[in-house]
Each structure stands twice: as structure tokens, then as C-alpha cells.
């Protein structure tokens, strides 16, 4: 009798594993979503010498409209694949402040320039991930995520005013004069957790992502001096959280509001200096740093075929 029970259990488990691993090609296994959001945040770049900070440039993002889109495939009962991204719709107003510490033993900056006519030229992101659901019920789901993400930002600062030599030299840059251009790119393979709770026609989706392997690259173009810095930082820490609250207006259509937050923390990396006029190149170890945080708030619609 015991042998028969074991055989029945084994057959049942084998059948469940086979069924649960069957690839789902039905149309209702695929959903698409689109939303409009507002992006805010700040990127910073740093210059170091023997561990001392010489320069910090803060590039702010202010209420920039973006469009988000994504496609999701419930490929297997326990596995979901997703591709998503967002991009700015057009260039937008931004802000840049440039601080330098040129006086030895002085903790407060000695040089500062302010550029209210800065523009965010573009920003975008793409994200590829998969979620394996280890808890799945009619009202809740919990899973582990594995993914890869890239995020890019580009700014240009023109005009503005300056205060040098501890305020002894002040003035204005000509209106419209190109001062500094800056591009930043972060890439990160990541791990994460995903969860979903369903109550009648409402649901809440939450995601948390983490990576200790983020990599930052940037290009800093100083137009007035005709010099360029290119920097690279590895093994940065990346954190991200998303909350999505939705309502199913039909079995196929869902409207939602969403808030996301992400941060890539500063770390020390290397820099390459280019004197474009003289053709000189110099590589500098442990001389650069960069970081970014940003958040979005928006609303959209999801459709399941």
C-alpha cells in the first residue's frame, strides 16, 4: 500500500512539474503598458587628488516629462519575462552648480559657478528582467528577480555667473555661451524581489532591486578651456524601488499610478584628461567619482491580450 502511495505521489509531482514548465504561447499571457510620468533627480561628478575633493558638479533634473512603455510575458506559470524602458520627450530646463576647493586646508568651497540656463538634452533607460515566482496564490505573489539595466543622461550648461577666489572675483558668462557639457551612463546587472497583492479589482505591485556591480561612465566637456574628461567607476551600489497601484476596469484593461525611486551611490574611479588644443592625454588613477538619484511619478494603462 505504501509503495502504491509513493507511486501516486511521484506521478502527481511529475505531472505538476511538467505542466508548470509548459511554455505559454496564448495571447493572454502577454501584456503591454504605457504611461506618462515626471522625472526629477540629480547627478553629481567629483574630482579627487590624493583622496581630497577638488571639484563637484551637481546636475539637477527638474519636472521633466517622460514616456514609459513595457511588455510582459508570463512564459511559464512560475516565470515572467519583461522588457521596459522610458525616455524624455524633449529637452527640458535643468540646473547646474560647479564647486571647486582650491585653497589648502579650507573646507568650504573657494570657487563656485551657477548655471540656471542648463538644459537636460535627453535621458533614457532600458530594463530587461525575469521573475521566478516561488509563492503564487489567487491573492498574492512573491518572486525573485534577475535583470540588467542601462540609464543615460545628457546635459548642457550655458551662461550663468561665477564667484571665484572666495568671492573676490565675480562676474557673468555671456548669455548663451556654452560652458560645460556632461553625459553620464550607468549599467547594472541586478537582483531583486517582486510582489503583488490582489483585492477584488484592485492590486498593488512592488519591486526592489539591488546591485553591487553597477558601472558608471561619463564625459565632461569644458568648452571654454577646450578640455575633456572621461571617467569610469566600477562596483558602485545601485538601489531601486517601485510601487504600482492599479484598478482593473475590464478583464483586459488596467489603469495604474506608479512611483519609482533609484540611486547609484558614489565610488572612486579613474579619469582620462584630454587637452584638445594641444593633443595631450593624461590618465589619472583614483581621481574621479559619480553618482545619481532620480524618481518618477506617473499614471498609465496596461492591456492584456
Residue ranges of each PLM-predicted region?
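Transmembrane beta-barrel strands of outer-membrane/channel proteins
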Residues: 32-40, 83-89, 132, 144-152, ...
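Extracellular/periplasm-exposed beta-strand and loop segments of Gram-negative cell-envelope proteins
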Residues: 41-64, 87-126, 150-186, 211-242, ...
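N-terminal signal peptide c-region/cleavage motif recognized by signal peptidases
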Residues: 12-17
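Post-signal peptide N-terminal segment of secreted/secretory-pathway proteins
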Residues: 68-72, 76, 80-82, 88
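Outer-membrane beta-barrel biogenesis signature
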Residues: 18-34, 201
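Residues on the lipid-exposed face of transmembrane beta-strands in outer-membrane beta-barrel proteins
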Residues: 69-73, 126-132, 146-148, 191-197, ...
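Repeated loop/turn-to-beta-strand initiation elements of outer-membrane beta-barrel proteins
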Residues: 77-83, 137-140, 201-204, 251-257
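Sec-dependent signal peptide recognition
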Residues: 2-9
